[in-house]
Amino acid sequence: MREVQKSLPPETLCAQQAADMAQINALAKREMTPEEVYTFSVRLCDNEIDRDGERFDAQTLRELAALFIGKSGIFDHCWSARGQTARIYRAEVCREEGRTTAAGDGYCYVKAMAYMPRTEGNQELIEEIEAGIKKEVSVGCSVREAVCSVCGAARGECEHVHGKRYDGRLCYTELRGAEDAYEWSFVAVPAQREAGVMKRFSPQTRRTLKAFLRTEGHKEALTELD
């Protein structure tokens, strides 16, 4: 997860570090130094069809990349301030040349850079990230619509079945129009094989923050919003 670019010349590394610190300090309450922070990369989500038979389109990924800047990293989607462990300071959509999705288009994903302070309390987590133990992530977000790839109807309003082909067209649900990004979490088993996306919205419910909280059972957070 952590990227080490040993091949870059020193002047490039210095410029990159300066740019990173400028973005980190835009989020921090006081100016941090490179020695005080640990940075690592995460693959948040992609445009591959996931275990739920759903996927984001490329445009929605670009929208999510912008929305996730500044969002907290937590554990298992447990919405508690005590669980905040890292924060995203940069995100972009990347493509893997030569790779296609099950839907037949070019594969792309949201790559994010996150930071956390190098404190005694974070040392164990940093070591787990470096060792590849804490690796899989899942995101909590909302989208404007979820439609059938075959007919374009809203999810649940047609008879097409995920995984089946109709006149050669694979059926899956396409998630379009990012509305909000809530958080990203370290999890054991993400919905997406490469990253992980948590999506438990009914097709009839507008995908708002309160709807997400009700679906996930976060009563305390709902009380704070109300």
Label each region the model flagged.
Residues 1-219, 224:
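Signature of dsDNA virion morphogenesis modules
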